[in-house]
């Protein structure tokens, strides 16, 4: 490709890298998937994301569910008050980071997404449900009455969540457990969003928590991440 306006040019791989803010390997995987081709891999080293496609789909649907509750749930006003008044966040920055609302109640997400046994099992494996100790095979929502922060991998796939309580409830922050697609020590919250602004990050600022990353981004500091 070649742009006569700015002089940018390259091949299909470099175009996908620039357009989608991906590295070389990620661009190869995207192009291979679009062409229905398989990327050769070392024997014995299958891609953990391909193995867990159903789980990733449910985590993405969970993020969408929480975002919808922030807009339409009868108790969404307190979430808006916390985000806008207490934290000073705009609706736009909340949208950029995909913030949501987990309503009060023990089975809201379960009822919305987990009607089938196999889906419940995937939600359990993804850390979204907790099994009742006194009733094996019965589950409840892990995240209840919290502001929800989806945790994305560098390609933008939702792999986990953090949930912030409104008051003094303990724990103040509740995070997803480690799963097949989420190892906390290997992820940086906000890295995907930072790459959308600057595909090649010369340096990053490491801050304490989710809200620090979001507040800095709202004020133009878009290269911060949290561990």
Language model: regions and residue ranges:
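Terminal amphipathic helices with adjacent charged low-complexity linkers/tails
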Residues: 40, 94-101
């Amino acid at each position: 490709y070649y742009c006569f306006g700015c002089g940018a040019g390259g091949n299909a791989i470099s175009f996908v890298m620039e357009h989608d803010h991906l590295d070389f390997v990620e661009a190869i995987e995207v192009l291979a998937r679009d062409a229905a081709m398989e990327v050769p891999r070392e024997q014995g080293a299958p891609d953990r994301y391909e193995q867990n496609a159903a789980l990733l789909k449910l985590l993405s649907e969970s993020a969408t569910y929480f975002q919808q509750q922030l807009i339409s749930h009868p108790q969404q006003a307190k979430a808006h008050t916390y985000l806008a008044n207490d934290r000073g966040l705009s609706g736009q920055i909340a949208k950029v980071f995909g913030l949501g609302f987990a309503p009060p109640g023990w089975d809201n997400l379960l009822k919305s997404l987990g009607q089938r046994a196999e889906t419940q099992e995937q939600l359990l494996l993804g850390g979204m449900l907790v099994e009742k100790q006194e009733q094996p095979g019965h589950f409840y929502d892990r995240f209840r009455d919290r502001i929800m922060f989806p945790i994305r991998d560098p390609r933008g796939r939702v792999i986990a969540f953090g949930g912030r309580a409104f008051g003094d409830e303990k724990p103040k922050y509740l995070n997803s457990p480690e799963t097949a697609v989420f190892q906390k020590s290997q992820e940086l919250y906000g890295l995907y969003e930072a790459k959308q602004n600057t595909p090649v990050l010369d340096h990053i600022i490491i801050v304490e928590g989710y809200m620090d990353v979001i507040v800095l981004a709202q004020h133009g500091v878009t290269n911060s991440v949290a561990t």
